[in-house]
Amino acid sequence: MKREDIKYIIESVMFAYGEPISIKELNYIINKELSSKEIEIMLNLLIEEYREQNRGIQIIKLENKYQMCTNKDYAEYIKKIIEPKKKKSLSQATLETLTIIAYKQPITKVEIEDIRGVKCDKVLQTLFENELIREAGRLNKIGKPIIYKTTDEFLKLLNIESLEELPPIENYQEVATNE
């Protein structure tokens, strides 16, 4: 199989799948005819091709996964044909809780409530509905509490590739102290 064909197979798989996909998953689909490094090179070639041609489709990187999506430069046109989800804006309490989860993850509901000083059931439900957090398992201690993490949707919302791109939390503590 030619390298160019493999690049187009990767492109087709990503288009059909629609969700973020890892290099390992792509490698499995291609039957390991290429190394992970070669698949990453192919992905980077596709990303660059789309970028250079200013195409309506782009490939974005989210943590260690890649996803094909529409180019945000053309969002106004996409909105005309797709009924946008009616997502209500997030309250201050919801944003605070999301921030806590983003910086402290994995974290339990009790730990969130200890930091905020109030119950957070409704806030967590809102974050689930907006697909900004997910259950990431359970702690191995009494009661087996659920632990929460942010999702790829959270990364997309902030237009970042990984949590490492979040600003250092010290910056926020300085602002809070100065107010």
From Swiss-Prot:
The keyword Aminoacyl-tRNA synthetase does not apply. It is found in: Cytoplasm. It comes from the Bacteria. One of its GO terms (cellular component) is cytoplasm. GO terms for biological process: cell division; chromosome separation; DNA replication. InterPro entries: ScpB_csome_segregation, WH-like_DNA-bd_sf, WH_DNA-bd_sf. Belongs to the ScpB family. Participates in chromosomal partition during cell division. May act via the formation of a condensin-like complex containing Smc and ScpA that pull DNA away from mid-cell into both cell halves. Homodimer. Homodimerization may be required to stabilize the binding of ScpA to the Smc head domains. Component of a cohesin-like complex composed of ScpA, ScpB and the Smc homodimer, in which ScpA and ScpB bind to the head domain of Smc. The presence of the three proteins is required for the association of the complex with DNA. This is Segregation and condensation protein B. It comes from Clostridioides difficile (strain 630) (Peptoclostridium difficile). The gene is scpB.
